[in-house]
């Protein structure tokens, strides 16, 4: 604990010395151009500022959740249209092409360098994303993202959600329903307490991270394709379900499975249930979600691994009129994973078949208008020790085969404009891959991975 406390000033001083000139230059660029009004495609489509849908991107307001529920199709702008006739199809097409761009540049420094690499890494860019995001037709809209990764030096599909949405009445109450095509379990969700859009909303791709993680906690992201349906009744009860298959973008088709640790056999069903209530100054959601998948590692036939994840989550947003309508957000989740790794065990990749993982996280965030936000978060993972599944290795390994990791996250973001985010984030580890000291068997401590991360993000 003492090492974690001491690390912050030392890393921060070095980070500020290197990166401060970049942030000063960015601030001057913004300050000297007060007429700049670059906004994402949803803002251009609706004529509304970013703050209508977001407390702070990607955190959705109740209005933003309704916009997503309705299929991203609300618009106040001109369209090219043609009425439906007996022998002609209808047309509703945005005059403006719904394209947006996100540009991220960042700096990362860990308390101790990673062996064989420099410390204090600047990525310019860290990534660049293109979004086809907006209304396609009267009931069809999209959030479709491709991202350039500087380390891989290529573009690839990122989070994508294409949906059909409509509404009716059921038992005299509002009934929303829709169909979603997406490539990441929970990317279709409306709240920020599930993995795809949960805190931290951004982070370093340079710093080490804990080895163990639940399947639903990002392990299938952009590696699957799914089709599902969702409903919201009376603006309170939300139900959703999606079935997924492995896709492996960039790999040969038909899929041979080679080189992929997860190859879904049949389909992997994902389910979601949530209850929400919204008043003038309060928004509360409590819910559960989960997934079940069977997989043949590195093959499409043979012995199977089985994963069953279930989770509980909540989100509470409180608008405080006495503080000029500043917002305080509370979010949390718990994921339980039960595994039967028969295939991995058969190939000597695990010491025994049955394992479990528990993942917990919680955070509280204060939004100062739409200009500043500060977040404090805690996270932890623990489960079945297995020195074969979690072997010893420098930096990424575990000396005792224990998957337990615990830590905290501090994040401060400043938006000089609603489409520009300047952030500083600190990650501290109390335990990493099972131990506080010499966790990898090569002399590295958990606090050695404590990280300062600086981000400049531009959205236009």
Placement of each model-derived feature along the sequence:
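Outer-membrane beta-barrel translocator domains and adjoining extracellular loop/strand segments
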Residues: 111-117, 154-159, 191-196, 250-260, ...
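Outer membrane beta-barrel
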Residues: 61-62, 94-110, 115-249, 265-270, ...
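Detector for outer-membrane/organellar transmembrane beta-barrel domains
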Residues: 281-414, 426
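N-terminal secretory signal peptides that target proteins for export/translocation
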Residues: 1-16
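C-terminal segment of classical bacterial N-terminal signal peptides
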Residues: 22, 26-35
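Transmembrane beta-barrel outer-membrane domains
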Residues: 94-96, 121-125, 153-157, 218-222, ...
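Outer-membrane beta-barrel "beta-signal"
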Residues: 49, 420, 446-460
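The canonical Cys-X-X-Cys-His
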Residues: 47-57
């Amino acid at each position: 604990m003492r090492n974690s406390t001491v690390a912050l000033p030392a890393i921060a001083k070095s980070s500020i010395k290197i990166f401060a000139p970049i942030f000063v230059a960015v601030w001057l660029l913004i300050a000297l151009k007060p007429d700049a009004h670059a906004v994402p495609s949803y803002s251009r489509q609706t004529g509304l500022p970013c703050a209508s849908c977001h407390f702070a991107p990607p955190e959705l307001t109740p209005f933003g959740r309704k916009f997503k529920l309705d299929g991203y199709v609300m618009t106040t702008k001109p369209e090219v249209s043609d009425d439906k006739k007996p022998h002609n199809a209808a047309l509703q097409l945005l005059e403006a092409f719904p394209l947006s761009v996100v540009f991220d540049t960042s700096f990362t420094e860990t308390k101790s360098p990673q062996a064989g690499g420099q410390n204090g890494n600047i990525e310019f860019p860290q990534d660049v994303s293109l979004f086809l995001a907006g209304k396609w037709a009267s009931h069809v809209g999209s959030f479709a993202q491709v991202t350039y990764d500087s380390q891989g030096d290529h573009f690839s599909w990122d989070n994508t959600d294409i949906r059909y949405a409509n509404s009716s009445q059921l038992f005299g109450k509002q009934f929303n329903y829709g169909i979603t095509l997406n490539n990441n379990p929970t990317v279709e969700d409306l709240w920020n307490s599930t993995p795809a859009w949960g805190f931290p909303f951004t982070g370093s791709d340079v710093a080490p991270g804990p080895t163990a993680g639940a399947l639903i906690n990002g392990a299938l992201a952009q590696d699957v394709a799914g089709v599902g349906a969702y409903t919201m009744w009376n603006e309170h009860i939300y139900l959703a379900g999606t079935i997924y298959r492995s896709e492996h973008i960039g790999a040969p088709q038909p899929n041979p499975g080679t080189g992929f640790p997860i190859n879904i056999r049949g389909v992997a069903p994902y389910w979601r249930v949530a209850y929400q209530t919204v008043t003038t100054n309060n928004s509360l959601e409590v819910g559960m979600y989960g997934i079940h998948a069977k997989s043949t590692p590195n093959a499409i036939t043979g012995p199977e691994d089985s994963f069953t994840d279930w989770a509980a989550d909540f989100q509470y947003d409180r608008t405080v009129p006495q503080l000029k309508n500043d917002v305080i957000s509370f979010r949390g989740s718990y994921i339980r994973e039960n595994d039967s790794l028969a295939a991995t065990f058969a190939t000597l990749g695990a010491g025994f078949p049955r394992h479990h993982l528990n993942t917990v996280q919680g955070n509280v965030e204060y939004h100062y208008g739409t200009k500043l936000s500060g977040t404090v978060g805690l996270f932890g993972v623990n489960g079945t020790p297995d020195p074969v599944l979690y072997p010893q290795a420098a930096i990424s390994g575990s000396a005792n085969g224990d998957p337990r990791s615990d830590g905290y996250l501090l994040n401060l973001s400043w938006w000089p404009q609603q489409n520009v985010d300047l952030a500083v984030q600190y990650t501290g580890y109390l335990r990493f891959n099972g131990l506080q000291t010499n966790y990898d068997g090569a002399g590295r401590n958990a606090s050695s991975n404590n990280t300062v991360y600086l981000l400049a993000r531009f959205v236009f």
